[in-house]
Amino acid sequence: RVLCPSLTFVATANAIKYINAEPIFIDSDPHTWVCSLDALELAIKKYKPKAFVSVDIYGQSCDYDAIQELCNSHNVLVIEDAAEALGSEYKNKKCGSFGEMSILSFNGNKIITTSGGGMLVSKNEDYIRKAKFLCTQAREPFLHYEHKELGYNYRMSNLLAAVGRGQLAKLDVYVAKRRKIFQEYQKAFSDIPGVNFITEPTSSKSNNWLTTFTINPKKSTSNRNQLIK
């Protein structure tokens, strides 16, 4: 069993299913939109999972001090889904650096793009070595072609990698621009009842790669489609 938030893109849960593990979904905090620490603790005690996949949703970092303390005390591995959080920070440390393994996305709609694909990050060399092996069709290190286990073609081309690396120098500029866009929307909609934006904790700095908000139908006179127009 592997825990993950229900508020996430389907790829988070798919990664769990790919290895025939069972995803257990947990609720998110209504203000920060990241995983609820209370829900996480209850799920750990009830389901005794092998791992927890945290999700830095819309660039918002999770509370990793609390998560790591809780998970470490129950021998639960933390995997950080930082697909949306390149350039985001938690206590002045970059998202993508908190899990035993972490992933970043370079999909076409992300803050830096290679048109697709992403990156696996880990301080554990064995994890990286195994990932490189699997992503190149699990070919054994022989002169001839020999494969003893199922592999995948998850390689990124050198050209696309160069495109991504070229954008890294401007990452801070991109983050500042996205944060400004978020603040402009927040200001423009501040007088509309029932519109709520994600709350950024003082310990976090989001890249705000995607500006999102919720609408309380009991308080708002406008619906989603009207606000989009």
Where are these regions (language model features)?
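Short active-site oxyanion
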Residues: 1, 116-117, 171
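PLP-dependent aminotransferase-like
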Residues: 1-73, 77-82, 89
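Glycine-/small-residue-rich active-site loops that bind phosphorylated ligands and cofactors
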Residues: 31-32, 59, 110, 203, ...
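PLP-dependent aminotransferase class I/II
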Residues: 38, 42, 51-55, 64-66, ...
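Alpha-helix termination/capping residues and helix-transition junctions
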Residues: 46, 95-96, 112, 153, ...
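Residue-level detector of structured alpha->beta connecting loops
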Residues: 48, 75, 99-100, 193
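Conserved active-site segment immediately N-terminal to the catalytic lysine
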Residues: 80-114, 143-148
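Active-site PLP attachment segment
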Residues: 97-135, 158
